[in-house]
Amino acid sequence: MSNKLLYSGKAKDIFSTDDEQVILARYKDQATAFNGVKKEQIAGKGVLNNQISSFIFEKLNAAGVATHFIGKVSDTDQLNKKVEIIPLEVVLRNYTAGSFSKRFGVEEGIALETPIVEFYYKNDDLDDPFINDEHVKFLKIASDQEIAFLKEETRRINKLLSDWFRQIGLKLIDFKLEFGFDKDGKIILADEFSPDNCRLWDAEGHHMDKDVFRRGLGELTDVYQVVWEKLQAIK
């Protein structure tokens, strides 16, 4: 297999494969926060992220969610369908936390009657600004129909994920998804799902996600290992 580096991101390197419709994602031992302002190498993080994301994507595939995930091929590597990434971060919030609490001046941990879906424009130079549907259309990122699908699919994924995490005693506070167009022009779930891009709290309100790194609350890999071990009990 000939692997040429196509893209180096904060958490993963993306390589070509012998199949032009398939890419290899290699998870890094790097933790970043605040758009890369805080950065640290943490041994074992790449393995844990690959394990967790592969597990979740396998379950999503089995539940009928169309994703880019093909399979885990090593401790740090997985094969994915090549997609044209939509430059949006789709965030769903089940509880108030993080930037939402700061933006609206509310305390963290308030359950939202209806989960809220938000869009953020993927642009590092602009610090990934919060945008609405009209901005998405103005920037020609997605049509009305595509926007509606992104929201509907994110809500469907939320129901699945919330149920799975509830089974193992964790609250899914919020999460970020990315989507892309496959070779047939179909929108499918891409990127990853791990404690890097979601918030998980246990019954005592302890953070079981990257906030441990953001806020200096403990050892990141210890927390991710607990999440990985708990995931084995999901039915």
UniProtKB/Swiss-Prot annotation:
Organism domain of life: Bacteria
Record family assignment: Belongs to the SAICAR synthetase family.
Protein name, as recorded: Phosphoribosylaminoimidazole-succinocarboxamide synthase
Catalytic activity: 5-amino-1-(5-phospho-D-ribosyl)imidazole-4-carboxylate + L-aspartate + ATP = (2S)-2-[5-amino-1-(5-phospho-beta-D-ribosyl)imidazole-4-carboxamido]succinate + ADP + phosphate + 2 H(+)
Record-linked InterPro entries: SAICAR_synt/ADE2_N, SAICAR_synt_PurC, SAICAR_synth, SAICAR_synthetase, SAICAR_synthetase_CS
Species whose genome carries this gene: Streptococcus sanguinis (strain SK36)
A Pfam family of this chain: SAICAR_synt
Chain segments annotated as coiled-coil in the UniProt record: none
